[in-house]
């Protein structure tokens, strides 16, 4: 199974949301300096949730791990998870894969969010051309502009939307890491009204 959607995932989503918003968030540059490992993503993220609270971290990571095991039939996996905030000043996201992991998941944590601010999954129409942009930094910077606001022509040439997943409070979305995907519209200006998700990265033990 490549994708799975579970509504009403957490038994106490309001408490988790309130607690998440109390945490310290970092941008990608700050995270790169803190962890001594280059990373690049829009908006702000917290530390790994297990470091924020071991009880919650253990509960939610175990739940997601069990679901992935049933989906894939694979035993033994590693999982990392963070809260992420993005707002209207973060522009438009870009279509990408998470090729360094086996599965990704995200949990929407905005009550009454506009459904159009969810996630789109894509088919890539020209993998060779898309991959060619990965060869150097200028190409990578170009990739980050392939969206519905900047390089629309190339966006429409390279990608066809396959699934549009609505942003629904307490909805968990799971998909394989090699699926092309993109966050849809960002919103808000403050912690309280920005797009809040909990993201998960899952890797099978070799």
Annotate each language-model stretch with its function.
Residues 88-206:
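Catalytic core of non-heme Fe(II) oxygenases with the double-stranded beta-helix
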Residues 1-85, 89-93, 118, 125, ...:
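Non-heme Fe(II)/2-oxoglutarate
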